[in-house]
UniProtKB/Swiss-Prot annotation:
PANTHER family for the chain: AMINO-ACID-BINDING PROTEIN YXEM-RELATED, MEMBRANE-BOUND LYTIC MUREIN TRANSGLYCOSYLASE F
SUPFAM superfamilies: Periplasmic binding protein-like II
SMART domains associated with the record: PBPb (SM00062), PBPe (SM00079)
Gene: occT
Highest taxon, organism lineage: Bacteria
Pfam families on file: SBP_bac_3
GO MF, one example: ligand-gated monoatomic ion channel activity
Record's protein name: Octopine-binding periplasmic protein
Signal peptide: 1-20
InterPro entries named in the record: Iontro_rcpt_C (IPR001320), Lys_Arg_Orn-bd (IPR005768), SBP_3_CS (IPR018313), Solute-binding_3/MltF_N (IPR001638)
Amino acid sequence: MRLKSIMCAALFVVAGQAAAQEKSITIATEGAYAPWNFSGPNGKLDGFEIDLAKVLCERMKVKCQIVAQNWDGIIPSLVAKKYDVIMAAMSVTPKRQEVISFSTPYGAHMNGFAVMKDSKLADMPGSGEVYSLNTQADAAKKRIDDVNAFLDGTTVGVQGSTTGSQFLENYFKNSVDIKEYKTVEEFNIDLMSGRVDAVFASATVLTAAFEQPDMKDAKVVGPLFSGDELGKVAVGLRKDDAALKAEFRLGAVGLRKEDAALKADFDSSIKAVADEGTIKTLSSKWFKVDVTPH
């Protein structure tokens, strides 16, 4: 009888372990923000966040499915539980934090302008300079004023519903015509065709775009800006997924606010892969610079 009880207990433990190993989560990405995330010629998702997601899922010992979701619906669909987390170069902002939860950041954004090389805007002041809106606020504001005067009367393209579009609205709405697009690819097309004079985006995204043959005549000009307004990238979760949040501590993963356990999993895993240098390695592969947040 005792042996039978022991065997039953052992089977229960094994079954429990198997169930834990079979845990799966679905990660949403945009699939249109290279090199952070994009769909290749074969339709397969690729990029920095795809590689990072695979590393994190392996560390958490969970099975992950990565799916593409249009940017405009990416947060509402998370809240509606169509998937479990967001990894889509999403910056952490107070407005987004009202709706979803975020992991510890796994990447940092630097944003700037790009123009065609033969543009009259190619000699924008501040080229090669980098300003933190957090620690160099006065110097950054002075340079923003210089760029405002330089861009007066021009049209600037930006992806809508992003920290970049909000930055332009906050600092440039009185001098430039801000034209919003659904994707980076759309505003790049209009830049090449002359329908916009400049575009504003993450420097990592712009640099990747310039590697494409049809974008070889574009370049980044003017200063680069970073700081809380432009965000650090994190995993996004529903607000109830706090435990999952703990496993992803460096990119910012977005989660539902109720997912506390999932958040915890992501936080700890992100911290671990950052500490061991994996994020730096993946940064070098995809961006040629280290985007590890500090």
